[in-house]
Amino acid sequence: MAYMCADSGNLMAIAQQVIQQQQQQQQQQQRHHHHHHLPPPPPPQSMAPHHHQQKHHHHHQQMPAMPQAPPSSHGQIPGQLAYGGGAAWPAGEHFFADAFGASAGDAVFSDLAAAADFDSDGWMESLIGDAPFQDSDLERLIFTTPPPPVPSPPPTHAAATATATAATAAPRPEAAPALLPQPAAATPVACSSPSPSSADASCSAPILQSLLSCSRAAATDPGLAAAELASVRAAATDAGDPSERLAFYFADALSRRLACGTGAPPSAEPDARFASDELTLCYKTLNDACPYSKFAHLTANQAILEATGAATKIHIVDFGIVQGIQWAALLQALATRPEGKPTRIRITGVPSPLLGPQPAASLAATNTRLRDFAKLLGVDFEFVPLLRPVHELNKSDFLVEPDEAVAVNFMLQLYHLLGDSDELVRRVLRLAKSLSPAVVTLGEYEVSLNRAGFVDRFANALSYYRSLFESLDVAMTRDSPERVRVERWMFGERIQRAVGPEEGADRTERMAGSSEWQTLMEWCGFEPVPLSNYARSQADLLLWNYDSKYKYSLVELPPAFLSLAWEKRPLLTVSAWR
């Protein structure tokens, strides 16, 4: 089985746990030498299921049963994956087992001993204080520029007095609170898009119904919309219940849209770098409080592990790699699989377009982290960055060898390529198809914000973010400054991009639901690969680490999508294709 790490983003934490396991084994052997018989030592405390949250209550229900792992293509049971929840199910009888077993041998432990000289705290701090924000996986979730001051939308003459009075009392986004240290966490979040009518029903709070009314009036009667919006802004607050907080950020975005619609000058853009560390800590807070990213990485990695079977050479093509956080657990699982570790693992990294025109330095740091970690595992590893824009790449750039098992990964990445035309998405998918992959893993937000008109898009986004705000409200206290930061600098920015003033080519928050992705994937020649019962059960076990009142569940969407849902509303969807 692969070793469990409570923080799947911290590569060195995994290695340190393995060293701890080795030390316990050595102590056990010494005791056995002197006493001939001793019971096995307990698992390390770091292996125990745990979840760092501001509010946490343990489950009292029975732990979900785990089925037998599905056989690989070579007739053997695939390796065991790690996830950030802090627990794992081995293929054998015991809940906790030897991390490497006989197949790994003592040579692996001798390699891992070098981790004692590796400063894991320094590595984590480097992600916060040294590298620019855009050089991390956070760019997949957060817009780097903080919101500028909100211009008040000019109302009609009849509404001028009411608007001015309410605008004076209405709260405005303020500077982020001071940095607080956060527990380390894994990585990406996401969503499902109901019809406009069901979206209206799910946003039944009066303040949200008023927002929906404002959005409908925005195009036809901006003055009326401004007057109604003033009342909403007076009642909304970023410190209230989920509906009040949601209204706070949506009213802000709609206010900007109305202002720009009347020809108001754009606000000056502040320095995009100033909130880098703040956003990094927000990202960690969210992933410590909610299982979104853990679910996505766990499920995609399990599909890759099963599809590659006992292949001796494995080539992963990651469209959108930055830190490579997703691959720590998979490298661990491949290094400890029953069939033996691969003779070579190669990752080809295509940088996200949001890394900017010069991603080389960021990817070099990613290369170093992954290479050093693979060395600790005793794995022959190669990282190859492709620095040309994705639309300029062709099959020959990937240097696929005939005896390699290829896996292509799109983790919260393809939606960046959506636009008024799907041509760029289709081009990239056809490129992936040309590599003859054993599997293509796709993780996307489950909400329709691409082709929908503004009113429907506003309703879809409001319903989606309502679920996110509620899930965070259960995980963190109302007075938590960390919660305020996450909602302001992560969710607030994305709301701004989805329903703010930008339209056409300037609108960058273009997500699509699973049915739209199914159409695109099948058009490009892919067919769905059902996720195994084992992958489903691992995801169930991940959710078991969260309190039952969190109301998380797994929802299967046809033909082969698995979604993480809040109160049965899908938020993040993962699928596999070939």
UniProtKB/Swiss-Prot annotation:
Comp. bias (Basic residues): 49-61
Pfam families: GRAS
InterPro entries to which the protein is assigned, alphabetical: TF_GRAS
Spans annotated as Leucine repeat I (LRI): 205-264
Domain (GRAS): residue spans on this chain: 198-578
Effect of K551A: Loss of DNA-binding
UniProt-annotated stretches for the region Leucine repeat II (LRII): 365-397
VHIID: region residues: 283-349
Motif LXXLL motif, residue numbers: 414-418
Effect after changing K284A: Does not affect DNA-binding
UniProt similarity note: Belongs to the GRAS family.
Name of this chain's protein: SCARECROW-LIKE protein 7
Organism per entry: Oryza sativa subsp. japonica
Gene: SCL7
